[in-house]
Amino acid sequence: MKTVVFPGSFDPVTLGHIDLITRASKLAERVVIAVAVNTSKRTLFNLNERCDLLSEATAHLSGIEVIPFSGLLADFAKEHNAQALIRGIRGTTDADYELQLAQVNKALNSELETILLPANAATGFISSTVVKEVFKHNGDIDPFAPPCVKQALLIKHSENS
């Protein structure tokens, strides 16, 4: 497979995301990380910060591009000549939701497939919300997020203090 798209808000990127991106990079020559401009979500990190964190966290991988997007994911995938979307699933609730989204994206772009990757057991419980909550309560986020995220959270915390 030549190109896949891995979409998300990544607020912030976690080791679960990095695991999925690493696995996706073994399936395709090019992985486009589509960072969502989601106006309905209030994010801790702005779009540029989220893109920068992803670029830093994936610098060790080849064939990775980090690109912000808004609008329909099916259109974005087509613009970037992607054959498939990569979506991580942590359980049956995620699977049900992702299957619905896959059908919508297929209806919008008949050439587009969706690949559901089960989360790794070691990272499947990690979410961006978990990272932010553990950090907020002075917990160690090293097992959950790349080092650049810890630094960014420390900076964000000092700016807000």
Swiss-Prot record:
GO cellular component, one term: cytoplasm
GO BP annotations, alphabetical order: coenzyme A biosynthetic process
Catalytic reaction equation(s): (R)-4'-phosphopantetheine + ATP + H(+) = 3'-dephospho-CoA + diphosphate
Cofactor: Mg(2+)
HAMAP family associated with the record: PPAT_bact
PANTHER family per the UniProt record, alphabetical: PHOSPHOPANTETHEINE ADENYLYLTRANSFERASE
Family in the record: Belongs to the bacterial CoaD family.
Protein name: Phosphopantetheine adenylyltransferase
